[in-house]
Amino acid sequence: MKIPLILVTIAIILLMVPTESDAFDLGGLIKGVVDLFGRRSLKNRDYFDYMQDPSLSNADLRELEELLEDY
């Protein structure tokens, strides 16, 4: 009874390793499939929420642009 328990434990550990690493990026795979089909409803449009921030002035935006131009 010990051998099947050990084998199941090893199998679970070996299945957990690729899902926790950055090499197995399930989010990137899903994004690639979504971009392949090009459906607008499935694309991430959250970045539009940050385009109009009333607390930022033109001077602030210019300063941010200067800081981030090398990225």
Swiss-Prot record:
Positions of the propeptide segment: 41-71
GO biological process: regulation of defense response to virus
Predominant place of localization: secreted
Sequence positions bearing Phenylalanine amide: F37
Sequence intervals crossing the membrane: none
Residues of the signal peptide: 1-23
Subcellular location field: Secreted
Tissues showing expression: Expressed by the venom gland.
GO terms under cellular component: extracellular region
Keywords: Amidation, Antimicrobial, Antiviral protein, Secreted, Signal
Note: Shows a low ability to inhibit hepatitis C virus (HCV) infection in Huh7.5.1 cells.
Recorded family membership: Belongs to the non-disulfide-bridged peptide (NDBP) superfamily. Short antimicrobial peptide (group 4) family.
Reported function: Antimicrobial peptide.
Name of this chain's protein: Peptide Ctri10261
Species this protein is from: Chaerilus tricostatus
